[in-house]
Swiss-Prot record:
It is an enzyme of class 4 (lyase). Pfam families: IGPD. Keywords: Amino-acid biosynthesis, Cytoplasm, Histidine biosynthesis, Lyase. Pathway: Amino-acid biosynthesis; L-histidine biosynthesis; L-histidine from 5-phospho-alpha-D-ribose 1-diphosphate: step 6/9. This is Imidazoleglycerol-phosphate dehydratase. Belongs to the imidazoleglycerol-phosphate dehydratase family. The lineage of its organism: Bacteria, Bacillati, Bacillota, Bacilli, Bacillales. It comes from Listeria monocytogenes serotype 4a (strain HCC23).
Length: 194
């Protein structure tokens, strides 16, 4: 089983996160940020992983530190669980419609960190959640997993729908990339290492 558990404690947050890439059971997610709980639940469902997150943060300031630190911890867990990345597809992509919105994700588990985030999130807040934190979250995930991650909203009107389409597309693309392919011997790179 490809699993990982990490604890990250700073002066601003305390994060406990575990992931199982090979078995999907009910995930338990409690971040103190309701909208993020919703998005992580969708991500876990569509990536077909088990994700458990317990976070306490300085949300009396805002959700920035909590969201970013969860992204960091998720990225570190993904990196550890994937280990040497033997026989995985490596690449994944997905288009996901959410009512009037269409989200797209393409990713490469290359060992090289990069984020392209192309999403016009016209509503700056959803409840008390700052929508600019979506990019911060994915930046933290991409750089700590060491993945090349491209996310784009092709069109849409409702900011919630746009973000939901991105999280679902990310989950589905990640599932494709982490799937073990018996036709791939070793790692999926001419370099022999990812």
């Amino acid at each position: 089983m490809r699993t990982a558990t990490k604890t990250r404690v700073t002066a601003e947050t305390s994060i406990e996160l575990s992931i199982n890439l090979d078995s999907q059971t009910e995930s338990t997610i409690s971040t103190g940020v309701g909208f993020l709980d919703h998005m992580l639940t969708l991500f876990a469902k569509h990536s077909r992983v088990t994700l458990n997150v317990k976070a306490d943060g300085d949300t009396y300031v805002d959700a920035h530190h909590t969201v970013e630190d969860i992204g960091i911890t998720l990225g570190l867990c993904l990196k550890e669980a994937l280990a040497d990345k033997a026989s995985i597809n490596r690449y994944g992509s997905s288009y996901v419609p959410m009512d009037e919105s269409l989200g797209f994700c393409a990713l490469d588990l290359s060992g090289r960190s990069y984020l392209v985030f192309d999403a016009e999130l016209t509503n700056p807040k959803l409840g008390d959640f700052d929508t600019e934190l979506v990019e911060e979250f994915f930046q933290a995930v991409a750089f700590n997993t060491e993945m090349n991650l491209h996310l784009r909203v092709l069109y849409g009107k409702n900011t919630h729908h746009k973000i939901e389409a991105l999280f679902k597309a990310f989950g589905r693309a990640l599932r494709e990339a982490i799937t073990i392919n018996p036709e791939i011997k070793g790692v999926n790179s001419t370099k022999g290492v990812l």
